C-alpha cells in the first residue's frame, strides 16, 4: 500500500530510522520533536516514496525508541530501512494550542515583514543545527537568509493571518535597519 506522494508538501517529518535492533525486525527510531508515547497514536507513517509503515509495537529502552513495523520481521529487512525518514500529515497533530503556540511546519510560507511593515520575503524553512532554532527566509531578492528564531529577532507571529514580523537588526540581517530596502531594490534591479 502506498501514500499519495503528491501530498508530501503537507507532510511533517516525524522520525528517522537509525538502525536495526535485535533479530526480530525491530528498529531504533530517532524522533524529531515528538514525545515517544505519542508516536503510536499517529497510526500509519509513510516515507518519501509513499510506502506505509504501520506500528505493531513500540517501547522505550535506554533513551531509545524501539519500534516494530508490520511486515518487518527480520534483521536484514530492518537493516535495509536505516536512514528512512518517516512522515505524518500535518492535520494529524492536535490543534488545541494556546494563542502563542504553533507547530514549526505552520511557519513555512508565512510572509515576513520588518517592523516598518515592509515585505522582506517568506519563511521557507526551519532548522536547528545545535545552537538554536533558525528560520530560513527567502527574501524578495530571491536570496535566502537564516535568522535566529528568538523573541528579539521575531517579535510577532500571526499564523492565522499568514505573517510574522522580523526586526532586521536583531535578526542580524543588517546593521542599519534602512539598508534592507536599498539592498533588496538593488538585487531586484540586477535581476
Curated annotation (Swiss-Prot):
Q: Which SUPFAM superfamilies match?
A: PRC-barrel domain, Translation proteins
Q: Name one GO molecular function term.
A: ribosome binding
One Pfam family matching this protein: RimM
Q: Which UniProt keywords apply?
A: Chaperone, Cytoplasm, Ribosome biogenesis, rRNA processing
Residue ranges constituting the PRC barrel domain according to the UniProt record: 99-172
Annotated GO biological process: ribosomal small subunit biogenesis; rRNA processing
Q: State if Membrane is listed as a keyword.
A: no
User: Which Gene3D superfamilies does the protein's record reference?
Assistant: PRC-barrel domain, RimM
One cellular component GO annotation, for this chain's record?
cytoplasm
Q: Where, per UniProt, does this protein localize?
A: Cytoplasm
* Major subcellular location class: cytoplasm
User: What family is it from?
Assistant: Belongs to the RimM family.
Assembly, per entry: Binds ribosomal protein uS19.
PANTHER family documented for this protein: RIBOSOME MATURATION FACTOR RIMM (PTHR33692:SF1)
Q: What role does it play?
A: An accessory protein needed during the final step in the assembly of 30S ribosomal subunit, possibly for assembly of the head region. Essential for efficient processing of 16S rRNA. May be needed both before and after RbfA during the maturation of 16S rRNA. It has affinity for free ribosomal 30S subunits but not for 70S ribosomes.
Could you give the domain comment from the record? The PRC barrel domain binds ribosomal protein uS19.
Q: What is this protein called?
A: Ribosome maturation factor RimM
